[in-house]
Amino acid sequence: MDKKIEKLCEKIGLGIAISIIIIIILFFNINEVAFGEIILYDTLPNYRINEEVKDIFNKDETIIVSNIDNSEEIGDIELIGIDDISYEHEKTDEEVKKSNEVSNSNIDIKKLENLDYLRQEFYIIDASTGMSKDYFDINKFLSADLKIEKSEDEPKVLIFHTHPHEMFKDSNTNDINEGIVGVGTKLANILEQEYGIKTLHITDSSFDMVNGSLQRNGAYERMEPTIRKVLEENPSIEMVIDLHRDGVNENTHLVETINGKPTAKLMFFNGISRIMENGKLNNISNLPNPYVETNLALSFNMQKRATEKYPGLTRKIYIKPYRYSLHLKPKTMLIEAGAQTNTKQEMYNAMEILAELINDVVFS
């Protein structure tokens, strides 16, 4: 009898042990998925976190999931904290499709108070950053003082190009004025001649060159001393525009017909000096930008005006970490007009509309 009881106990003990092992295996498998995703999300700037995992770690009013799944290099991980992360990677078709989704021209302000709805309608959020209510407050955006008095005597607007060698489909690559610099000249001329807004245009072509070779890395650092000096010498300047063109797949054409003309699409770009770490948005302490809120208010109001007036002209606002050139003045904009697959004329047509929007939002 004792032997039977002993054997029974051994079986029960073995069963309990097996059950415990199974529970442990299941526990670690589940957590490996969840925490593995968080690790990938925090480590790889473009890893899209699973929605269920997001819900575990997202308990406040912060959206930490990207609404794109792009293909930027993992090498950017090593550059976190450097103010020159390239955002001009060749975008995937899916990313371009997302950014080209047209916002509803009948804007419902009340709905935009919901952070998730605001994101869906207006923004593309890079996976290495996120949105929080303190920065993305629709009521603050709408009440922001963005107005500037016009002047034909003193410059009010500064236009420059951190990447001046960006070219277009039909550009003569040997002539700097055939690329984005020439587009900046067009914008400056329209602002002055049609709207009476004195504008200074910097055509320095050295920012993205090192020893005679094209070098985008470090362009923002090389740009800043020159532009800082210009701003010090021209204290009347209140609005700064860093004008770029995007980089997309060669089969992508960012164009919309506006006023009967083929017009390159515009995309407003914001770096918010915040990065996602361990499921939380943290300030990037060595890249301070005291003007983030005004930057965001300006791009939002430009996007809103464009959506109301010219549906389809603008892509969604692109949000990334870091600060780029956006810390130079409160009313600073980084704008990507068209891409390398657009023609010069499509770009010039876009400048007519961009100048109109600037006048509407800032100078009227």
Where are these regions (language model features)?
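Solvent-exposed loop/turn segments at secondary-structure junctions
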Residues: 164-167, 205-209, 245-250, 272-276, ...
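N-terminal, intrinsically disordered, polar/charged segments of Gram-positive cell-envelope systems
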Residues: 30-150
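Catalytic-core regions of hydrolytic enzymes
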Residues: 172-187, 191-256
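A short, glycine/acidic-enriched catalytic loop
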Residues: 249-287
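Short glycine-rich His-centered loop
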Residues: 155-175
